[in-house]
């Protein structure tokens, strides 16, 4: 991320994982934290995942109801509904706290995450993403309006919905943070910081007080669920 520029307000990108949005109480906690920071003058962009285990439930329902014959393109449209619901709830909750926001849906003309057509594991086309972010998302951030963007979801140049595969919301967050020149990227999960192992499997994993990209890649390769290696392709090198 870029170094803090004293001539402008601090700018952050925050991504909320599904477990942190699992019910109305957790959503309210997340929204209140964002609203509090926004009232300090911080410029914020928010990326949200689907609530709780919504994606798994949609996947199971679609596959079982179709006897496993659902096409990948159709499945992506179904799975995207989780995030498309989350952005609407999050934006409405911000509005209820007096915070101006605007959600970005993948069917909007100014949707910023453009991908190839590898359904279920699509790859963002970075130059197209950055052009859209600079044109449509950045002006909102600079005005103090909070964009709420669906993580995990993309759209092809011919306007078909895609999903980005495992770690897709993190991929969205890294792309937004880099293109917006964010001072900070915050990935909010249900773990207490970045752990050396999955705390749901290992009873006493170590909490890592500081971390570099090489270590993140190692954790990703080991199967640690904090972040997926694909998302790290899009991390700012700074």
Question: PLM ranges: what are they?
Answer:
Residues 236-238:
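Short, intrinsically disordered, charge-balanced linker/junction segments flanking boundaries
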């Amino acid at each position: 991320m870029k170094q803090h520029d004293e001539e402008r307000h601090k700018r952050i990108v925050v991504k909320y994982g599904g477990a942190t949005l699992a019910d109305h109480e957790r959503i309210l906690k997340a929204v209140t934290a964002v609203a509090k920071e926004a009232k300090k003058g911080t410029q914020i962009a928010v990326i949200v995942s689907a609530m709780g285990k919504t994606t798994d439930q949609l996947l199971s329902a679609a596959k079982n109801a179709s006897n496993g014959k659902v096409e990948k393109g159709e499945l992506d449209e179904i799975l995207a509904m989780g995030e498309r619901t989350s952005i609407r709830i999050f934006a409405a909750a911000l509005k209820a706290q007096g915070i101006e926001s605007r959600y970005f849906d993948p069917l909007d003309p100014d949707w910023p995450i453009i991908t190839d057509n590898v359904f279920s594991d699509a790859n963002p086309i970075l130059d197209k993403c950055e052009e859209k972010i600079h044109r449509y998302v950045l002006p909102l951030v600079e005005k103090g309006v909070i964009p709420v963007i669906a993580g995990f979801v993309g759209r092809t140049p011919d306007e078909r919905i895609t999903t980005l595969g495992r770690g897709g919301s993190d991929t969205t967050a890294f792309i937004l943070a880099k293109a917006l020149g964010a001072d900070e990227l915050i990935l909010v999960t249900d773990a207490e910081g970045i752990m050396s192992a999955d705390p749901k499997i290992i009873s006493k994993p170590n909490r890592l007080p500081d971390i570099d990209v090489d270590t993140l890649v190692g954790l990703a390769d080991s199967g640690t669920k904090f972040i997926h290696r694909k998302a790290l392709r899009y991390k700012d090198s700074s």
